[in-house]
Swiss-Prot record:
The keyword Iron does not apply. It comes from Nasturtium officinale (Watercress). It comes from the Eukaryota. The keyword Membrane does not apply. Binds 16S rRNA, required for the assembly of 30S particles. Pfam families: Ribosomal_S14. PANTHER family: 30S RIBOSOMAL PROTEIN S14, SMALL RIBOSOMAL SUBUNIT PROTEIN US14M. Belongs to the universal ribosomal protein uS14 family. NCBIfam families: PRK08881.1 (NF006477). GO terms for biological process: translation. GO terms for molecular function: rRNA binding; structural constituent of ribosome. Part of the 30S ribosomal subunit. This is Small ribosomal subunit protein uS14c.
Amino acid sequence: MAKKSLIYREKKRQQLEKKYHLIRRSSKKEISKIPSLSEKWKIHGKLQSPPRNSAPTRLHRRCFSTGRPRANYRDFGLSGHILREMVHACLLPGATRSSW
């Protein structure tokens, strides 16, 4: 189980990303439209004004049951070992083990 502080920090990052999403998107569009380099640098400075934690690359998917940030499966929202345990216990409908 992940620490509560780490899960809270991740939620805070998600809120910041939602808040500054439009600012980032609009300034990126402006950069692509303007041909002069000096104006692009001005807009680039504006792009760096939001906080670092509002960048979408800082977000991690976390397991719903354990909060683990690694080895997550998007379809289920679970980490690998929890997914395996739930499939073995037949708790996930439609998930089958493959063997060959």
